Amino acid sequence: MGVQAKEQLWGGETTKAVDNFPVSGERIPVPLIHWLGRIKGAAARVNAELGLLDEDKANRIAAAADRVAEGEFDDQFPIDVFQTGSGTSSNMNANEVIATLAGDDVHRNDDVNMGQSSNDVFPSAVHLAALDTATNQLLPVLERLEASLQAKADQFKDLVKSGRTHLMDAVPVTLGQEFSGYAAQVRLGARRIQNALPQVAQIPLGGTATGTGLNTHRDFAPKVRALLTEATGLEIRPPEDPFEAQGNRDALVELSGALKVLAVSLTKIANDLAWMGSGPRTAIGEILLPELQKGSSIMPGKVNPVIPEVVLQISAQVIGNDTAITVAGTQGNFELNVRVPLIARNLLDQIRLLTSGCRIFAEKCIDGIEANQEGLNRSAEMTLSAATALNPYIGYDKGAEIVKQAAESGRPLRDVALELGVDEETYDKAMDLRTMAQGNL
């Protein structure tokens, strides 16, 4: 092996890119670096198998690329993520680092980049980094979050409370029904992500510069895909059309959209939980959120819904990232999209944020939620909308009059209803809150 020590391994093209793009101080995402290494290693092995690359060179290139893939040289990728839109600078960075590690007789372009172009390698690495992290990191965490929410749905299935629409009192529901809805949102969100991944798994590798495959062996791409699939367990696929795969990043835009929908769902869930846990004395107070830390530097005893607030901020960032990805996705002019580093940065950031956010949401919030029976009873008994259950017996207009008088006088619905002629047996039959919450279920 050529170089062992942690010295500067990149060459002149990387240095030029560092000088040209002093933009954000943010480097390309680490999973992308690792997938560049995996692709380069598989490419070297396949080129040797095809008789195109000296076997000894190929072995050294593959060994060096494997070390990049394992994260040993993350610090050797210094180029800003805001760089040339094809990712050429980072592809050259990978070629230079691997060539230096592999030995002086290894050429960064002729050997390490054999059969490849930045235009097919870099987006392929982005696709596979997204496929890998979504499959192996995000989806298992979503399964965990769904299970946590469903466990609470089962725990709270008999606890009746006031429903709310337009932030106003509505007919009763159970707390378990609300959590069942939250679990379904997460489950459906995971399904949307899963449905987007087969398209992400279609990579443009083998198209080289414009999708034609110029300067690459016709068996190169299938064999590289097979090696990567065998090594990772991911089902990596050929594109339906090489020019579609080369000229746009629609599959990544689609995945981002699914991630955005999940963020929208998490926003609803986190907001609901923060509202239901509000108080403890002057607001809704139907649930008790875990007390994790002091909520104020001036108000003693104050506790805030810190985990829902984190989830809300993560969701806002994910939605913002999706907007940037959507705009970047429109820049697939002719044979190449030239906003790929931006897409990579924002998409992998979405996956990372949602993975960590959903994990702490389950572990530090959902698992520890308890029902506040006093608050639930208060909301269930005080909602005037429960009078809706009287409609089949007395009609809408008379029910509306009962609600109006109860609201104006502050008297219980029962007292007003009996006073206006509803017999006691009818009232008690219609106004059983638990039966009411079941609706026609």
Label every model-predicted segment.
Residues 1-441:
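Conserved, well-structured ligand/cofactor-binding cores
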